[in-house]
């Protein structure tokens, strides 16, 4: 995508006046790849496409060591403490009072016969189709073609090495002289989530809770290698862009608000250095979401799988002091759904373990999307739950699920969602020595260690933009974010321009619940009496990707783009143009957007 010459300004203006939007998409989006990273999924596609490929952000690697865990996050702490259990029951009762259903202890003692219940069978056509689908275990083998002369001509050492690497004692029964069955070295996407725990694979999630999943058991180098492998596989298998062709492609990287400077730099190195793109630009999800829905000013509420964020955007510029990061998302709603069913003894006596068997999380996510909604009154349905035992076909169990309107209320009562606690990353991961010009060396890092603080609380990112999670509900986060925006006229506009994006934003009844809860959360001293959630013009889970595509296509100046050779040689340096002469921050160089 060549940069226009300085004397072609008028021709560009004439071009924009006459060209059709579809023509701009096809002409400028054909060699522009948009990459939107998330904790659970990564969305990748050409800017001219209607939708991206939505692929689970994980990789399963073949392992030879016996006794090694099948999931790298095996060390996650999911034990609920006594205090957390008390807080969870209290949060349940608060939600029950709002939904006009029986409290937790009342429900368990009085039974379900006397309840006034509503029944659901899937609230939309897509959910009705998905609710009865069954997952199958991934075939971890592949055929290895062998020449008929290979037994006599191949050296014994070479044959032994290849056999010990990934070839099990499984042969093709049809023609053993021409092919063998061997383990696949790497498996990506949903296939990786459906590998049986008995198979010799370890599952890696390079991004967790909105950050690189760096821990003593998962090095930063391996995280970057896995991200590179996942993106490379998508580019090759889904978009069919070879390594040689990528020198003529450009990338728009849409990153979560949770990413810090070092993670952004690592992504630029992966995209430009390892994936061979010609140039790249970085935009944050909040800004991309505004453009994805064709607005300029809005409060963006992004409810992801593991993290939710709130940020306000005014006239195409994100307001850093309005940013809120909440450590829960759609997967926590799934786990809450499982807890409630087990509490009421509605869940079959099967081994459902969302950590050891990610396939169980896929099943719970289907149940959540099909049946969970926010509405008053008892809500039950008959559903088919499947048990997935190691290597065995799925076994169906019909059961009566109850209190299906409570799990999504965890967005407003976060104590209802007890999130996993992740291992602490190494201390040196937080310290980016290339940011000395930001005076971070002169800031208090909290003394020695974390002093028992949460994972990201003690990390000083920059004086104006701390990356700190807040343990408040969604309504309080939205209200606090907008009230931090400043002018009263801007606040009124933002309260009337709330956008819900992300997969969990599809929950039926969530829009009305957000409007009601936010209105009640506004202090009486504020002269604001209107709260409105705007309908999304694009599928909520793809809004940020679509916005990244629009930003990339409309950026005719391309002054904010970083070229491959420039990044590999110079790395982070202040821009040479006037707009960047005082900018030492990576955000100022890589995230700057120029209106055409």
Swiss-Prot record:
Residues 148-178 are annotated as: Disordered. It comes from Arabidopsis thaliana (Mouse-ear cress). This is Actin-related protein 9. SUPFAM superfamilies: Actin-like ATPase domain. The lineage of its organism: Eukaryota, Viridiplantae, Streptophyta, Embryophyta, Tracheophyta. InterPro entries: Actin, ATPase_NBD. SMART domains: ACTIN. CDD domains: ASKHA_NBD_Arp8-like. Belongs to the actin family. ARP8 subfamily. Disulfide bonds: none annotated. It holds the Pfam family Actin.
